[in-house]
Amino acid sequence: MELPRLYAITDRKKYGENFLETLEKILKKGVRMVQLREKDLKDRELYKLAKEVRALTKKYKALLLINERFDIALAVEADGVHLPEQSFPPSVVKRVNPNFIVGFSAHSLESAKYAEKEGADFITLSPIFKTSSHPEAQPIGLKTLKEVSEKVNIPVYALGGITWEKIKVCYKNGAYGIAGISMFLE
């Protein structure tokens, strides 16, 4: 399966009061892969929101991945999960559901290679640039993006401080796609 090039990551605090309306605007712009990443929600709240997001992503024929919560992903019939770097290995997900798309958050060449070896379908590599989402994180830069993109055989999504003006330079440095939170709100 060919993955979409744009990957939106949700953030209720940045989306504002009309979460689903904001997400629908993003989908109307052509984004076809969404990660529901709302770590602060309790199980029942996350499940309820995930069901609503699943209905919306189906309407736009977009893929839905749930951040780390394999149980919620199964319950709402999402297309897969996105695993943080310190989460369980992608191979565990693939063993339970071989059809699930598994994304993995990598922050170095080492973790990108680990993700590939463990069966991840793609990685997000971050932060490429300084980002408001994680102001304490040191940017890894375009050189690392290029190196990782050349040394792994799975799609690499550039993430972190990406603006519409920086997309082209990310693609020039090997990015398969672009992931982000704020950029899709512009």
Swiss-Prot record:
Its cofactor is Mg(2+). Mg(2+) binds at E68. SUPFAM superfamilies: Thiamin phosphate synthase (SSF51391). It catalyses: 2-[(2R,5Z)-2-carboxy-4-methylthiazol-5(2H)-ylidene]ethyl phosphate + 4-amino-2-methyl-5-(diphosphooxymethyl)pyrimidine + 2 H(+) = thiamine phosphate + CO2 + diphosphate; 2-(2-carboxy-4-methylthiazol-5-yl)ethyl phosphate + 4-amino-2-methyl-5-(diphosphooxymethyl)pyrimidine + 2 H(+) = thiamine phosphate + CO2 + diphosphate; 4-methyl-5-(2-phosphooxyethyl)-thiazole + 4-amino-2-methyl-5-(diphosphooxymethyl)pyrimidine + H(+) = thiamine phosphate + diphosphate. The keyword Magnesium applies. GO terms for biological process: thiamine biosynthetic process; thiamine diphosphate biosynthetic process. GO terms for molecular function: magnesium ion binding; thiamine-phosphate diphosphorylase activity. Pathway: Cofactor biosynthesis; thiamine diphosphate biosynthesis; thiamine phosphate from 4-amino-2-methyl-5-diphosphomethylpyrimidine and 4-methyl-5-(2-phosphoethyl)-thiazole: step 1/1. Binds 1 Mg(2+) ion per subunit. 4-amino-2-methyl-5-(diphosphooxymethyl)pyrimidine binds at Q35, L36, R37, E38, K39, N67, S105, H134. InterPro entries: Aldolase_TIM, ThiamineP_synth_sf, ThiamineP_synth_TenI, TMP_synthase. Its EC number is 2.5.1.3. Gene3D superfamilies: Aldolase class I. It comes from the Bacteria. Keywords: Magnesium, Metal-binding, Thiamine biosynthesis, Transferase. GO terms for cellular component: cytoplasm. The keyword Magnesium applies. Pfam families: TMP-TENI (PF02581). 2-[(2R,5Z)-2-carboxy-4-methylthiazol-5(2H)-ylidene]ethyl phosphate binds at T131, S132, S133, G161, I181, S182. Condenses 4-methyl-5-(beta-hydroxyethyl)thiazole monophosphate (THZ-P) and 2-methyl-4-amino-5-hydroxymethyl pyrimidine pyrophosphate (HMP-PP) to form thiamine monophosphate (TMP). Belongs to the thiamine-phosphate synthase family. This is Putative thiamine-phosphate synthase 2. It comes from Aquifex aeolicus (strain VF5). The gene is thiE2.
